[in-house]
Amino acid sequence: MKKVIVGVLMMVGAMWSFTGCTSNQISQKETHIQENLNPNQILEVLKTGNEHFVHHKNAFPHLDEARMKEEVSGQHPIATVVSCSDSRVPVELVFDRGIGDLFVIRTAGNSLDDDMTMGSLEYAVNHLHTKLIIVVGHEKCGGITAAISQHSEGKEPKEISNLIETLRKGVEPFVGKSEKLDDAIHYNVDQQIQKILQNQELKDLIDKGELKVIGGYYHLSDGKVDFLN
């Protein structure tokens, strides 16, 4: 498995060598990356990146001035990440990726409960051609904590109360069971994945092996992501 991962990373590194390329050539080469990495290979890239982060050995790729200029002509991310808005979950750092590598959708409780977020997800897959979607929940999620607590009712401004109520729909079996927070966070991740699977167009891509959807659980304490099937 390690040989496979190394091979994938070498291929990615070779493909991302754009010195001397025009903007059009750069765009073509980035598209070429998407065409040559399948969903499982992209997942291995993210797993390896997370190992770098956990062991404080981030490579910090694609963060220089050249990369910034390369991305002006268009974006070609390799994966879509649905994550919580929590400032303690720095998605690109967690997976050791740089500018233009990931299409990130961040909402409270990593929730996909409106047209804006689902539309963003569909855009990433249908127009940017990302082949992997990972929905990442995290340890001690404040949104899910509030959603399963019965002590927050009536104490928050209207907008926050509406947000909590929306999140509560995704963790209904755990309302009033604050001691089950981790279980609720995992359950919520699965509920968001189920929403994705209800989209027939995305489901067709999954069935054809052109798109992979998985869950993740991020540990605040050590930076590790548990990849959930």
What are the residue ranges of the model-derived segments?
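C-terminal motif of bacterial Sec signal peptides marking the signal peptidase cleavage site
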Residues: 18-20
